């Protein structure tokens, strides 16, 4: 879509006159005349045109950012007025909750529109400047002029997180003191609600991508139901946020941005953010074993990282964390096993690289002197030893750093629902794999160049040393008791959410604002982004192709798709209820019939949801169970032994196959081309190579048999039994021809199955079994015939009273005589 059309469609009508006059600036550039190649004097661009354009551009900048500053200050004043109405208990009791909430809703909506206003106008200015430089390359670029003017406009670098925090505080007052608030507010837990510690709890985590255009709207939607979470100086064991409320962010114009939806990447300015800037330094070895284990879903695949807040020059607290995700394959539930140590900077090098126990001994000594319990000391000592041994055993070293800003939403004291949004994510290489030109000093745990106490330290990064993730990552954590019957699906649409938050969470996650990416991992994405071309990576994450497409959706289209999805879910549920009733009626009459269990019903429902919403490439543990047909199937003939050997029937006859034919309704025809075959065939290279490797092995068997055939045939005249040798040569020649034809036919059949994306089984054991049987029979026949001929020759010599030569030792002669009796004439 052209930007001019996009701007016209997204303009907020009350502020229409305050947006950039994009079309007017385009007319100043005489774009149409330049493209037509006109030689008219009016179409020529001269110094006067340049000065007029710059003057008009400056006027538009003043108009746009003057309005933005005015609106921002107006919002802050109105918020201050609301805060004055709630500064005492008496004022809160006398407050008109409905009117107060209406004003809050207006402020929240205007904040969203102002963020959109800022983003659209900045994009417009950037595009018009780029257009000028492209049309008139002989004239100086006005990009530097734009940057200078933007720095002079204070509202350009204005952060919107203070607005969100203040609005969040006012929403909390409504939640805490009024039961007459609107349903979203009233449904939320009270500010002081606390979860009982007596109940065993676990959590489910769901990951989403959020486009920067939608980031502010997503935050404001969440803010209506959950307050922004502000952390104290020291995080708790369950918090993976860090210990700072504010951080000074030194931004690079191409790398790190602010926490608003219009990042400072575009602005090129430093901004004061109310969201913490988190630095996470991940460990791995040269073979990327931790990455491969995590991506290949090996259970309990751990990750190791160093984490701190803000700039390292400010001497923040640094935590070394070993985090292991333990998943229950039966239920799909997961819980973290977290081992965390707080380290001092001066001891990190020795602890990581040298196995130094000095810091461990000092820490334990201080804690012992302060009266810490013996059990706690033992546990801490075990944690030190566990992490240090883990580093040494796996030869781990710092590999890359992730820098991002985080906004968290959670009701304090109630962690049943928690939402975090990580924005402006940047991955930075910090490995020392290259011995000659290491990125990081091998004897230092971090890059000293970007952690130096200088302005804009990220400017030291070279091309290829960093990668910026194009979207923000939203994570929703849902906590429930261990006996809860939550679905094992990795998609949030298939999970039963708490009643208090289910409706708005479903509305948000099914909207056009977010895209769900199951099992997304920042650690995995960082390795794939920075080291994707490395041959040591066994596999790449399934979501990489989605990064090449625009995840934004048209709101109307998303709404229509959601309506269709809900209708389909209702139809599926109705069919399931009918099937359940029928199974309950028929069960007394047919004891052999197996009733449909509740668990299977949930799986079928989940599969229906997945089909309606489009499946992801993420493989889940429940996938084999969810591929059950929901229609009445025709009977298929029973598999015979030969059909199974030939690969025409699956060996698992008790398992329903996707290939089974279903009865179609009247008037409905089976499509010739299935949707699953519409796109290009994306098959992993190892599948093709496995097929070719099998074919090559068959060719080697064919070659060996052909050598054996012609060796026997060429030595027939020299053989003791020429007739037998001649027969064997013909048998082996036929077996050679069979091997060649069989290997080629099976190879082509498997290629066809792969290209058609068929679920047909690839096993075909008839060939190997037949070759084995023929070889066994020929060996037995050769053995028997040879003994019979030997017995016949022996008998002829005895009849002629000639001496029979004995070629075997005296001990084995009884066995020889026995074989002669068994297979030929007696030697007596």
Curated annotation (Swiss-Prot):
Residues 1-693, 749-766 are cytoplasmic. It is a multi-pass membrane protein. Induction: By low phosphate. Residues 627-636 have a biased composition (Basic residues). The record marks 22, 26 as: Important for inositol polyphosphate binding. CDD domains: PolyPPase_VTC2-3_like, SPX_VTC2_like. One of its GO terms (molecular function) is calmodulin binding. Residues 717-727, 788-828 are vacuolar. The chain crosses the membrane at residues 694-716, 728-748, 767-787. GO terms for biological process: engulfment of target by autophagosome; intracellular phosphate ion homeostasis; microautophagy; polyphosphate biosynthetic process; polyphosphate metabolic process; protein localization; vacuolar transport; vacuole fusion, non-autophagic. Residues 610-621 have a biased composition (Acidic residues). The modification Phosphothreonine is found at residue 620. Residues 580-636 are annotated as: Disordered. InterPro entries: DUF202, SPX_dom, VTC_Complex_Subunit, VTC_domain, VTC_sf. Changing residue 130 to A: Abolishes inositol polyphosphate binding. Coiled coil: none annotated. The keyword Repeat does not apply. It holds the Pfam family VTC. Residues 1-146 form the SPX domain. Residues 127-134 are annotated as: Important for inositol polyphosphate binding. PANTHER family: VACUOLAR TRANSPORTER CHAPERONE 1-RELATED, VACUOLAR TRANSPORTER CHAPERONE 3 COMPLEX SUBUNIT 3-RELATED. Belongs to the VTC2/3 family. Accessory subunit of the vacuolar transporter chaperone (VTC) complex. The VTC complex acts as a vacuolar polyphosphate polymerase that catalyzes the synthesis of inorganic polyphosphate (polyP) via transfer of phosphate from ATP to a growing polyP chain, releasing ADP. VTC exposes its catalytic domain VTC4 to the cytosol, where the growing polyP chain winds through a tunnel-shaped pocket, integrating cytoplasmic polymer synthesis with polyP membrane translocation. Present with 2915 molecules/cell in log phase SD medium. The SPX domain has very high affinity for inositol polyphosphates, such as myo-inositol hexakisphosphate and 5-diphospho-myo-inositol pentakisphosphate (5-InsP7), and moderate affinity for inorganic pyrophosphate. Its affinity for inorganic phosphate is 2 to 3 orders of magnitude lower. SPX domains may integrate inositol pyrophosphates (PP-InsP)-dependent signaling to adapt cytosolic phosphate concentrations to different metabolic situations. This is Vacuolar transporter chaperone complex subunit 2. The gene is VTC2.
């Amino acid at each position: 879509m052209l930007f001019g059309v996009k701007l016209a469609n997204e303009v907020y009508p009350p502020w229409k006159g305050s947006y950039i006059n994009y079309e007017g600036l385009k007319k100043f550039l005489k774009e149409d005349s330049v493209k037509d190649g006109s030689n008219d004097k009016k179409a020529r661009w001269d110094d006067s045109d340049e000065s007029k354009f710059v003057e008009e551009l400056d006027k538009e900048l003043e108009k746009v950012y003057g309005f933005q500053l005015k609106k921002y200050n107006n919002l802050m004043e109105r918020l201050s007025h609301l805060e004055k109405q709630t500064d005492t208990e008496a004022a809160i009791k006398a407050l008109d909750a409905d009117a107060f909430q209406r004003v809050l809703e207006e402020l929240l909506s205007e904040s969203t529109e102002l963020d959109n206003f800022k983003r659209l106008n900045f994009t417009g200015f950037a595009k018009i400047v780029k257009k000028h430089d492209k049309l008139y390359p002989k004239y100086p670029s006005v990009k530097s002029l734009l940057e200078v003017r933007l720095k002079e406009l204070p509202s350009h670098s204005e952060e919107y997180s203070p607005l969100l925090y203040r609005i969040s505080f006012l929403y909390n007052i409504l939640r805490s003191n009024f039961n007459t608030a609107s349903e979203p507010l009233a449904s939320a837990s009270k500010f002081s609600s606390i979860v009982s510690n007596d109940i065993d709890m676990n959590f489910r985590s769901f990951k989403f991508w959020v486009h920067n255009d939608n980031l502010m709207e997503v935050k404001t939607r969440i803010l209506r139901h959950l307050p922004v979470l502000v952390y104290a100086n020291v995080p708790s064991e369950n918090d993976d946020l860090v210990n700072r409320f504010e951080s000074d962010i030194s931004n690079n114009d191409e790398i790190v941005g602010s926490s608003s939806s219009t990042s400072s990447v575009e602005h090129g300015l430093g901004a004061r953010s109310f969201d913490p800037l988190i630095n996470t330094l991940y460990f791995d070895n040269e073979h990327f074993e931790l990455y491969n284990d995590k991506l290949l879903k090996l259970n309990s695949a751990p990750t190791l990282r160093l984490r701190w807040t803000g700039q390292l020059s400010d001497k923040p607290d640094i935590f070394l964390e070993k985090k292991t995700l333990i998943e229950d394959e039966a239920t799909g539930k997961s819980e973290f096993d977290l081992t965390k140590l707080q380290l001092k900077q001066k001891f990190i090098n020795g602890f990581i690289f040298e196995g130094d126990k000095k810091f461990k001994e000092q820490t334990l000594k201080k804690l012992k002197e302060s009266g810490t319990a013996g059990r706690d000391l033992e546990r801490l000592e075990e944690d030190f030893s566990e992490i240090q041994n883990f580093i040494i055993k796996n030869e781990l070293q710092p590999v890359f750093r992730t820098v991002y800003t985080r906004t968290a939403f959670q009701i304090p004291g109630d962690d049943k629902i928690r939402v975090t949004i990580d924005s402006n994510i940047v991955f930075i290489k910090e490995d020392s794999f290259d011995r000659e030109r290491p990125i990081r000093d091998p004897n230092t745990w971090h890059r000293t160049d970007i952690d130096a106490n200088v302005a804009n330290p990220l400017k030291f990064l070279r091309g290829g040393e960093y990668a910026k993730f194009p979207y923000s990552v939203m994570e929703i954590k849902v906590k429930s008791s261990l006996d809860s019957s939550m679905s094992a699906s990795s998609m949030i649409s298939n999970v039963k959410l708490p009643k208090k938050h289910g409706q708005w969470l479903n509305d948000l996650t099914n909207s056009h604002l977010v895209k769900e990416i199951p099992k997304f991992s920042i650690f995995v994405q960082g390795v794939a982004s920075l080291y994707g071309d490395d041959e040591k990576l066994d596999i790449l994450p399934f979501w990489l192709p989605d990064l090449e497409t625009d995840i934004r959706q048209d709101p109307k289209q998303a709404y229509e798709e959601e309506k269709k999805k809900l209708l389909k879910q209702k139809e599926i549920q109705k069919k399931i209820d009918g099937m359940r009733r029928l199974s309950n009626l028929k069960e007394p009459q047919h004891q052999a019939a197996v009733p449909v269990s509740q668990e299977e019903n949930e799986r079928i429902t989940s599969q229906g949801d997945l089909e309606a919403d489009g499946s992801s490439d993420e493989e889940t543990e429940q996938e084999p169970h969810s591929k059950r047909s929901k229609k009445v199937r025709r009977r298929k003939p029973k598999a015979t032994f030969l059909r199974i050997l030939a690969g025409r029937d699956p060996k698992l006859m008790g398992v329903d196959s996707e290939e089974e034919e279903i009865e179609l309704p009247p008037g409905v025809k089976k499509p010739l081309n299935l949707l699953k075959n519409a796109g290009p065939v994306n098959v992993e290279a190892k599948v093709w190579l496995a097929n070719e490797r099998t074919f090559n092995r068959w060719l080697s068997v064919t070659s060996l048999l052909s050598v054996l055939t012609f060796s026997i045939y060429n030595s027939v005249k020299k053989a003791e039994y020429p007739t037998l040798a001649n027969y064997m040569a013909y048998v082996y020649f036929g077996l050679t021809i069979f091997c060649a034809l069989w290997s080629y036919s099976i190879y082509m059949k498997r290629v066809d199955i792969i290209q058609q994306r068929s679920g047909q089984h690839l096993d075909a054991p008839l060939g190997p079994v037949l070759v084995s049987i023929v070889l066994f029979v020929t060996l037995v026949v050769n053995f028997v015939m040879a003994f019979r001929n030997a017995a016949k020759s022996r008998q002829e010599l005895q009849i002629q009273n000639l001496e029979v030569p004995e070629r075997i030792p005296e001990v084995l002669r009884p066995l020889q005589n026995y074989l002669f009796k068994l297979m030929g004439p007696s030697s007596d």
